[in-house]
């Protein structure tokens, strides 16, 4: 028998073994799963928009189903009750993140807050929560209001000239400045571009990291393909090093000028709380803060403008509500008006539902074998993929329609009595005990449980001040041609490049 034939038989045997392993039930309580193929498992089903593909699969296979991501057994959660059971009631078994070669490179071998595990994560979360709490809220609001004013000023030119306004770089600068101001007292000046000047040493490699992590890496899921991704990982390593070096200089400045009685920003707070002994952690947490706080909010602002430009009647209604609250002579909207603008707030929340910034969040791992209250068995080591986008789609009426009024009606009708009620409904083959259209429980842009987004309050202020002041100052339109609402998948989902026409409000 020739060596070639032996290799062929071995290959066929390995493929047969892999096929059997990935399709064999390990208990009678296994969730459903589609047929897996050797090597890839179910990766071929993800397509270019995995969040949409998984949402459709949930309608067929249920609110929890198994998928093999290459070598990794995974379970996709598209049921708010199951997600709450795992992430809230049993969070100690599900708070660790999944790791991979790409993640280890980005996180400095898991020393950040996004991907650290076990006691390390608990310590980092405690430091960050304390630092955010001690960062004075009024100071934060003042910083955001200032940046919102800079944003409006930068948009005025396009309203006067009639030139198309491409919002991407302006919204990114707005959100990046907020994060850098709060994080380490740095900003991009009003006349400086994101891609130019000293700050570009941070921004350009930072965006490269986002693109690298968002594009996926087969080597993270099929171990023997890792050599083919050597150069991609090397590029990620180089960009991560550039970001680290830039932030290290800022860290050293903070150490040199530290006044423990008067901390200036989040980095000062972290240095004080760690006694200046956790340099790597502080720098990598700062990188996380940039990632979570800038890109997600910038993309949400873009989607907000797209939906209101494509739905001028909704824009008109939101503007009329805003003017009725702040008055026509108002120069700048502040946070004090937020509670009096339910329709505008509903438009922002509906944007987060329709285009959840991180639709599949970050993958976690089951620390031990676990049986859900519904009798589904989750083996130790299983990856948990929370389909936040799918939950916000499959548990509301008319999910593909942009309806801010659903939020207005929801909060108007929400009472403590209704909050305590529980019904069981089967919708799209997904069983839920949560009330139909219980929006606060099925729209989860910041995730849930102890490992949710620690900066969600800052994010909400950020979005309200930007959206309200843009609406106050400009009527924006799609120029008579509907803007493409198809998203581009990544760590955060973005719209395709687009422009809007701005008209100064009278």
Curated annotation (Swiss-Prot):
Compartments reported by the entry: Membrane
Keywords attached to this entry: Heme, Iron, Membrane, Metal-binding, Monooxygenase, Oxidoreductase, Transmembrane, Transmembrane helix
Entry cofactors: heme
PROSITE patterns to which the protein is assigned, alphabetical: CYTOCHROME_P450
Record InterPro entries: Cyt_P450, Cyt_P450_CS, Cyt_P450_E_grp-I, Cyt_P450_sf
Binding site for heme: 453
Membrane-crossing segments per the record: 1-21
Name of the top EC class for this enzyme: oxidoreductase
Gene3D superfamilies linked: Cytochrome P450
UniProt cross-references to SUPFAM superfamilies, sorted A to Z: Cytochrome P450 (SSF48264)
One biological process term in Gene Ontology: response to imidacloprid
MF annotations from Gene Ontology: heme binding; iron ion binding; monooxygenase activity; oxidoreductase activity, acting on paired donors, with incorporation or reduction of molecular oxygen
Cellular component terms per the entry's GO annotation: membrane
E.C. numbers: 1.14.-.-
Membrane topology type: Single-pass membrane protein
Pfam families: p450
SS bond list: none
Organism superkingdom: Eukaryota
Protein family per UniProt: Belongs to the cytochrome P450 family.
Protein name: Probable cytochrome P450 519E1
